[in-house]
């Protein structure tokens, strides 16, 4: 079974009737072999299914319509084995509402120089057939991924898998529902946004619920369910002995187990893949969920604090895109700085950082929480894994959306942080904190982000391209001057692109 189960990508091969039944039979056989090779590859995380070779405008339109209506098809790989006149593709490409990747490949890797003849030349025409197809895609102003190289090589298969993961992210975006418990943190700007515009742009729905709706489900959780959940905690984490020695702390842990099980039922029953809450809206709940939120993220749900539904969506989408990979994804906040020989950012939040990014087995402890509400709250404490990561922020610009991506390198803290009982990660932004923070602020990036070690910069940008939004990258080569120029150019482009 592939990572993404019954989801699939269709390989659609273009040709034309001109070549006759013999060539078309060989084209079909080769397409089946390529699809089978990709499906069997350990580098490709999704099933690739070859469709019948399309040879006319009607056949192209039919396969586009079939893809649109098939719930398991998340995207198409298009390839011209022979020459396929591109005017035939206009109707189908305009009708297609799922993403496609243009695979510029050839069935054979090498030319049989001593034996090559015109039959071989007629059969293997992707070198110019794909150029014809590329022309009409550009003429139609369709954004798409182009992957070039022999289909059987590891490099090409990795690129194909990367795109397939983005297609899965886009599929999730189209079907995602986000539950908002309460509202945004009062007077905060960046967590606001136009939810109707977001649904039009990204596909996901945002639904608001009063705390009473959640409270009913939480209160219905039984003591037996809570006891069983605490046994799970004992297996998964290093639980502080003080919790079981202190009746008050043990009650705080039981509160958290009840919150987790109640929220899980609410989200599962409602078909939600992400959620938000706010420490200013807790009426009816025992406390701001800490451990509960962390565990729900670990189970795959997206989360955004203080009502930040855009970040909640991005965390969920990053988790879907990175399924089966080593790196985790979490809600995160740029909390405080270390100005030293190398400037660093300490990322954390009040409680809600996902243990999928933990470097070691998390500790489960109860500590006093003093922001917004004053409660002892159970939470997981850990430090993030070292290595490359991304901080991704999606913001509402008023008339459009922008994605800001900062490449960072997560490092080990130089000392222990015994007085900081929260999950955290310490990172060094690329190219450095001075430039990265300046660029981020110029771009209007949020103080929250989707922090991920599971997807690449190219995958984040490809997702933004599928969504039709601006993406700007702050990385090793960024300068503030060039970045500001890019923002100005992008402002003009995105203002004009749909009308010129």
Swiss-Prot record:
| Pathway annotation | Carbohydrate degradation; L-arabinose degradation via L-ribulose; D-xylulose 5-phosphate from L-arabinose (bacterial route): step 1/3
One of this protein's Pfam families, by short name?
AraA_N
Q: Which cofactor does it need?
A: Mn(2+)
A GO molecular-function term, please? manganese ion binding
Q: Which reaction does it catalyse?
A: beta-L-arabinopyranose = L-ribulose
Q: What does this protein do?
A: Catalyzes the conversion of L-arabinose to L-ribulose.
Which PANTHER family does the record associate with it? L-ARABINOSE ISOMERASE
The record ties this protein, via NCBIfam families, to: PRK02929.1
The entry sums up its family as follows:
Belongs to the arabinose isomerase family.
Protein name per Swiss-Prot or TrEMBL? L-arabinose isomerase
* Lineage, highest ranks first: Bacteria, Pseudomonadati, Pseudomonadota, Gammaproteobacteria, Cellvibrionales
Q: Which gene encodes it?
A: araA
């Amino acid at each position: 079974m592939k990572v993404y189960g019954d989801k699939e990508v269709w390989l659609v091969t273009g040709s034309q009737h001109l070549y006759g039944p013999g060539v078309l039979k060989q084209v079909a056989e080769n397409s089946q072999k390529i699809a089978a090779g990709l499906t069997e590859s350990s580098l490709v995380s999704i099933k690739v299914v070859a469709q019948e070779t399309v040879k006319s405008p009607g056949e192209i339109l039919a396969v586009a319509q079939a893809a649109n209506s098939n719930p398991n098809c998340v995207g198409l790989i298009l390839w011209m084995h022979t020459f396929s006149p591109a005017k035939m593709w206009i109707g189908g490409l305009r009708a297609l509402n799922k993403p496609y990747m243009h695979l510029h490949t050839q069935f054979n890797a090498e030319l049989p120089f001593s034996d090559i003849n015109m039959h071989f030349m007629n059969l293997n025409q992707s070198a110019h057939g794909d150029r014809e197809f590329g022309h009409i895609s550009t003429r139609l102003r369709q954004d798409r991924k182009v992957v070039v190289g022999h289909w059987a090589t590891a490099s090409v298969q990795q690129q194909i898998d990367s795109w397939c993961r983005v297609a899965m992210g886009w599929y999730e975006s189209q079907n995602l529902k986000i539950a908002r418990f309460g509202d945004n943190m009062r007077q905060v700007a960046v967590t606001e946004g136009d939810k109707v515009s977001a649904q039009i742009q990204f596909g996901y729905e945002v639904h608001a619920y009063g705390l009473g709706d959640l409270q009913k489900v939480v209160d219905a959780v039984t003591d037996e369910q809570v006891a069983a959940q605490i046994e799970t905690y004992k297996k998964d984490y290093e639980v502080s002995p003080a919790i079981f020695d202190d009746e008050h702390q043990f009650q705080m842990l039981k509160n958290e187990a009840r919150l987790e099980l109640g929220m899980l039922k609410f989200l599962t029953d409602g078909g939600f893949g992400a959620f938000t809450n706010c420490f200013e809206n807790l009426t009816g709940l025992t406390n701001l969920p800490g451990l509960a939120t962390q565990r729900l993220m670990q189970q795959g749900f997206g989360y955004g604090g203080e009502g930040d539904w855009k970040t909640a969506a991005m965390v969920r989408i990053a988790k879907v895109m990175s399924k089966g990979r080593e790196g985790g994804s979490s809600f995160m906040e740029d909390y405080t700085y270390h100005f030293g020989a190398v400037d660093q950012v300490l990322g954390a939040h009040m409680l809600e950082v996902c243990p999928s990014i933990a470097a070691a087995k998390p500790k489960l402890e109860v500590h006093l929480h003093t922001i917004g509400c004053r409660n002892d709250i159970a939470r997981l404490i850990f430090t993030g894994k070292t290595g490359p990561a991304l901080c991704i922020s999606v913001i509402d610009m008023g008339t459009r959306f922008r994605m800001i991506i900062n490449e960072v390198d997560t490092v080990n803290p130089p000392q222990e942080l015994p007085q900081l009982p929260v999950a955290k990660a310490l990172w060094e932004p690329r190219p450095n904190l001075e430039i990265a923070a300046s660029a981020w602020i110029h771009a209007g990036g949020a103080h929250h982000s989707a922090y991920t070690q599971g997807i690449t910069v190219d995958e984040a940008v490809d997702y933004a391209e599928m969504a039709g939004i601006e993406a700007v990258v702050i990385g090793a080569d960024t300068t503030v001057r060039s970045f500001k120029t890019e923002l100005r150019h992008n402002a003009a482009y995105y203002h004009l692109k749909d009308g010129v």
